[in-house]
Regions:
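Short, structured segments at the rim of ligand-binding sites
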Residues: 1-192
Length: 192
């Protein structure tokens, strides 16, 4: 067998797909072991919607008055679904419907209703599970009551551009009260 140990927990889409096609592998936290396969088998794949693409509709549904938005068949893989946890921490009215764990990837329909959001702290192990959603989450925090702190997101400074600085600049351009920090930002809500 071949074993790989990573320094941090990462997305597990490849491991799930290989198992779905019959590969023998074992995942434990940051380690994956795979045994040689003589044959993999085809299987029907239902490709779910990307949670990163759904974040805009989630945000609109939470912020716009008298909204109810249903987003069908969204991937809710725990290595990617930090958005759901942050929405829960912010007091969002977000419900998972029709959860399905029978495919290679877990899916659900997301039902979102207008909510009075509250500030929260977003840090640590959840950051890699929502790194692509952070710009929209930061915008949502502008509408939340209280001060939202985002930290441990220094990775955003070294992607295609310094996304922390760009987020802060754009949030300020729309009138938000936001401070840039070394590895994230502080957003004082109630001032979109």
């Amino acid at each position: 067998p071949t074993s790989v140990t990573e320094s941090a927990l990462t997305r597990n889409h490849t491991e799930l797909m290989l198992k779905f096609f019959g590969a023998e592998l074992e995942s434990k936290e940051t380690s994956v072991t795979i045994w040689p396969a003589t044959e993999l088998f085809g299987n029907r794949i239902d490709v779910p919607g990307d949670i990163s693409s759904s974040v805009y509709f989630v945000a609109a549904g939470l912020i716009l008055p008298n909204s109810e938005v249903l987003i069908k068949n969204v991937g809710i893989n725990p290595t990617r679904a930090g958005l759901i946890k942050v929405c829960e921490a912010m007091g969002a009215d977000l419900t998972l419907l029709n959860e399905n764990h029978g495919n290679a990837e877990p899916t659900a329909d997301l039902l979102v209703r207008t909510s009075s959001l509250k500030a929260c702290t977003i840090e640590g192990d959840i950051i890699p599970t929502l790194i692509d959603e952070l710009p929209t989450i930061a915008m949502m925090a502008c509408f939340a009551e209280g001060t939202t702190v985002i930290r441990d997101a220094a990775e955003l400074k070294v992607k295609e551009s310094n996304r922390i600085a760009i987020m802060v600049e754009n949030l300020r351009a729309m009138g938000a009260d936001v401070e840039e920090t070394e590895d994230g930002m502080i957003i004082h809500g109630g001032k979109p």
